[in-house]
């Protein structure tokens, strides 16, 4: 195994494993492709460098254990295109830090992705900080890290299709800054873990729009700030308040807001 690895060009296998165990610096744009079969793409260390990285894994999984963006990437796309790229995505590390962006735009998954995207590791704080839009598309999302925070500066954060499941310590924060372009869209339900503890949900969109489905299952406080809020489902807390701080549109019929004390 190398102590460090520079990548400046594409890497392609015919359905074979791509296993990179050294810290990676991108010195050129790169497309990492493991074919249409079950070849996993596994980065066991960090990824940095001001370039574009595109990963396509077929039916194999994409596993990135280390942090991304010590030097911010220009963009990160994982299984963004191609009907055959349906493998799950596991990001154990962070994208950037709580104070510095780790990349420009991020696009994980696409409409044909039938599996899941998992963020974080148990006991480790989760930060996903970018200077561009964050677009995620999968049938389900698992947030495993401590207090995952998705942050942009006036850019959108979108979770398409599936619902979000929050682990016991995964208090969710999405903060898109103070401008109008930082919309927050979550098409699936947000749910905690049924273990008797509660997790909080904080959505801060500045003047941007917020559109969410339902929130429930061991959820604590729910706070939503934005330039207009659209509810496509009900919100239920098991031990906290519901605080919505802007004009709200009920997009469907019977929507209820229920706290633990009624």
Each predicted region: which residue ranges?
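Extracellular lectin-like interaction modules
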Residues: 1-262
């Amino acid at each position: 195994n190398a102590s460090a690895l520079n990548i400046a060009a594409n890497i392609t296998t015919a359905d074979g494993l791509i296993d990179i165990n050294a810290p990676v610096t991108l010195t050129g744009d790169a497309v990492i492709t493991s074919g249409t079969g079950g070849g996993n793409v596994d980065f066991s260390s960090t990824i940095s460098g001001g370039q574009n990285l595109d990963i396509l894994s077929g039916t194999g999984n994409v596993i990135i254990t280390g942090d991304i963006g010590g030097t911010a990437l220009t963009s990160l796309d994982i299984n963004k295109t191609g009907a055959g790229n349906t493998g799950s995505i596991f990001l154990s590390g962070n994208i950037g830090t709580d104070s510095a962006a780790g990349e420009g735009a991020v696009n994980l998954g696409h409409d044909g992705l039938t599996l899941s995207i998992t963020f974080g590791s148990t006991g480790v704080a989760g930060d996903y900080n970018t200077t561009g839009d964050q677009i995620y598309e999968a049938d389900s999302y698992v947030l495993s890290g401590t207090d995952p925070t998705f942050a942009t500066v006036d850019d959108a954060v979108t979770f398409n299709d599936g619902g979000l499941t929050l682990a016991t310590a995964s208090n969710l924060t999405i903060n898109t800054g103070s401008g109008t372009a930082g919309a927050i869209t979550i098409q699936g339900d947000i749910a905690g873990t049924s273990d008797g503890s509660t997790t909080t949900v904080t959505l801060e969109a500045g003047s941007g729009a917020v559109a969410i489905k339902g929130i429930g299952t061991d959820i604590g406080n729910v706070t939503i700030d934005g330039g207009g809020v659209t509810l496509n489902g009900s919100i239920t807390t098991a031990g906290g308040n519901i605080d919505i701080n802007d004009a709200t549109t009920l997009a469907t019929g019977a929507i209820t807001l229920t706290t633990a004390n009624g």
